[in-house]
Amino acid sequence: MSAKDKTKKRILSAALELLKEHGYQGTTTRLIADKAGCNEVTLFRHFGNKQTILEKVVEGQTFGPDLKGSIDQSIVWDLEADLYKIAKGYLDFMRSIEDFVMLGFKEFYKIEELNDEISKGPVEFKHYLTQYFEKMKDRELIIPIDCEQLALQFIWMNFGYFISKARFGDRVTALPDEAFLKGSVQLFVRGISP
């Protein structure tokens, strides 16, 4: 990694940490530069402005090649086994960016320009799942059904559990992750199996 790339990475890491701590309004370019160990001129040379930094932070926190790759490697075309692995991978990924997701609900919705960037991850995951369900339908391993709708229902089920746990801890349910994942996947599979 070049020195320029290392500097960019430090700036983005500092920005994310400060955004979690102070929110968008409270995170100044001066604070970001200080935390990253550079001056504001360097920050502006790399990113131009605070908005661009925020956009790059968002890009780094969405469904990407790592999650897709780990799921792809574990697909065996067994509906229950695959959906369990997908749900587990999704929950683990969402937990890894939990602070960012909660910050998004608290702060980022106010910044209209970010909505397209923020929605890229969920849209990409929806497309990925839709393609998986289409292949399962082609193999006649699920009932004839609208696969995009199926993907959305699967995502919402898992996202709802994640948000409930992230926001309320065990107040809504003390159900362990493993019990939720197994139970919800079994129910889902029962509903779409031929």
Residue ranges and their predicted role:
Residues 1-22, 27-38, 52:
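Basic, helix-initiating cap at the start of DNA-binding domains
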